């Protein structure tokens, strides 16, 4: 009897594919909307994800790209704008970033 391995992508792998609708990364990278609820859902899942070289790379990728979104938003020469930007959201991201960094 063949044993099928569970090949369902974990939360981080799904985030890495920013074309998947309904993810934090898709909302921010493709729709220019910082969805705080989706970010919080991602953070809640982190303790359930095995720490591997791959998960570390993906977390670093998420941090880097979200940081780039904020940098681009503040760059007058860049057309990218976070539609729901506020100082409060940026401050929240700084808190969330620290949580993510603990898993790298």
Model-identified regions with their sequence ranges:
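Residue-level detector of alpha-helical secondary structure
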Residues: 43, 47-50, 90, 97
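Short terminal alpha-helical segments
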Residues: 1-43
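Amphipathic, non-membrane alpha-helical segments in soluble helical-bundle scaffolds
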Residues: 32-40, 53-60, 86
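Short hydrophobic interaction/assembly module
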Residues: 48-72
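Amphipathic alpha-helical binding modules
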Residues: 63-104
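Alpha-helical rod/repeat scaffolding segments in eukaryotic adaptors/tethers
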Residues: 25-32, 52, 79-82, 86
């Amino acid at each position: 009897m063949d044993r099928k391995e569970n090949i369902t992508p974990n939360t981080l792998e799904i985030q890495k594919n920013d074309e998947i609708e309904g993810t934090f990364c898709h909302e921010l990278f493709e729709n220019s909307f910082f969805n705080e609820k989706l970010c919080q859902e991602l953070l809640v899942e982190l303790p359930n994800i095995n720490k591997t070289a791959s998960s570390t790379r993906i977390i670093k990728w998420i941090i880097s790209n979200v940081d780039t979104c904020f940098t681009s938003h503040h760059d007058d020469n860049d057309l990218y704008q976070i539609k729901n930007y506020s100082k409060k959201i940026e401050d929240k991201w700084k808190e969330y970033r620290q949580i993510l960094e603990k898993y790298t």
